[in-house]
């Protein structure tokens, strides 16, 4: 393994293992028990990996936007932020990817909120402080049983209804241990209980 700082691991439905590191993307080779470095993401800090319901792979990078790998066609596509295009990716520092129960893909960024991918038009819808969110730094998204999306930030916790786009913000004033949450610290168990990690627990 050519990079020791592994940040994320994804095992696909076909059994392939992909590893995101601070120095690029690797794919594990079972037959030779070694790794192939993926040229398309060479030297790129790969923060998160997600396999969507179609079997496509999405890769979040720390400064190079999002990459999508179409497994069937074996083609890559890079989505980048464009200041002149409000329907582009909101920011190139993407730290988390989430697919909800409606099969919608969401991308959380470190500085420009989060966005939803629109497959019909191959573009994005942006959500940030200009739309009433408490921060533009979004660490993690988790869905509850009612379809609400819970977003952790560096300035509180947000409960967001993606259908009505209504939201409620929770802070230490509502009993949170801290308004500052941690990267990738969120989980919903089989009973629907949600666990979210902050700097104070």
Where do the PLM segments sit?
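Carboxylate-rich, polar loop motifs that coordinate divalent cations or form catalytic acidic clusters
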Residues: 1-201
